């Protein structure tokens, strides 16, 4: 009888431990075009509705000058010391250089394939190369930010976890597994259910995600997402966890 009670007590403790475990969650939108970060905001709002006791902070690296991004992220992590960091990677940018030439990747490849004019051919492939280089540059930069964020947060909580999701991830999720620290959760799709289960300590096997260092399930991207009921976003709450909220409302810079 006594033993049974102890077992129950341990279970209870374990549950509480898990709750405490993710007491602080930092959501980071990785650099991209500064468009209002509706996706990650909905996530933060959803977490707050499910777990009102969890402390959250939100940072949007899209509005930070690119040469200050790394320092800014490090400072935020030092101040907040999160147990879980969610990185949202909106899309892979297509940077048009100043001369505007490398604008359209499809246009470039078509020019290469179909033009008789050799100069045009060279220009086409050069545009494509520039574009590929900027993709790689961005992938390198963002994966470096994730690695740095994890390392920094581990100084304060050695069991800190990282989840990476967003539009770009859905596109090349298979390649990311090798570029990120082992154990990073790579999420394809929305992420609300995944986060809810993860914070509760439930199994996330059914969710559209996989751990860096393991192989993703075959055709992961084509699995049906499990629906979540969308509710109105509590913008008062969002303002409280994201000091720069008004940057967008006031029309940028």
Language-model features: where?
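Acidic, low-complexity intrinsically disordered segments
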Residues: 1-253
């Amino acid at each position: 009888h006594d033993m049974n009670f102890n077992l129950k007590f341990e279970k209870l403790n374990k549950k509480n431990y898990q709750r405490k475990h993710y007491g602080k969650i930092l959501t980071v939108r990785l650099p991209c075009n500064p468009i209002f970060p509706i996706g990650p905001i909905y996530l933060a709002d959803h977490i707050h509705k499910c777990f009102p006791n969890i402390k959250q902070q939100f940072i949007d690296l899209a509005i930070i000058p690119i040469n200050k991004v790394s320092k800014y992220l490090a400072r935020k992590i030092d101040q907040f010391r999160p147990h879980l960091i969610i990185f949202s990677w909106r899309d892979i940018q297509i940077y048009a250089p100043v001369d505007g030439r490398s604008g359209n990747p499809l246009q470039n490849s078509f020019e290469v394939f179909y033009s008789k004019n050799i100069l045009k051919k060279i220009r086409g492939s050069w545009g494509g190369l520039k574009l590929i280089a900027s993709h790689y540059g961005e992938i390198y930069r963002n994966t470096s930010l994730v690695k740095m964020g994890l390392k920094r947060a581990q100084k304060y909580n050695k069991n800190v976890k990282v989840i990476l999701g967003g539009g770009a991830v859905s596109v090349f999720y298979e390649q990311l597994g090798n570029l990120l620290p082992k154990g990073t959760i790579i999420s394809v799709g929305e992420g609300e259910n995944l986060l809810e289960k993860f914070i509760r300590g439930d199994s996330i096997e059914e969710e559209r995600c996989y751990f860096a260092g393991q192989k993703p399930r075959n055709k992961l991207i084509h699995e049906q997402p499990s629906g979540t009921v969308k509710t109105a976003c509590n913008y008062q709450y969002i303002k409280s966890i994201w000091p720069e909220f008004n940057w967008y409302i006031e029309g940028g810079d």
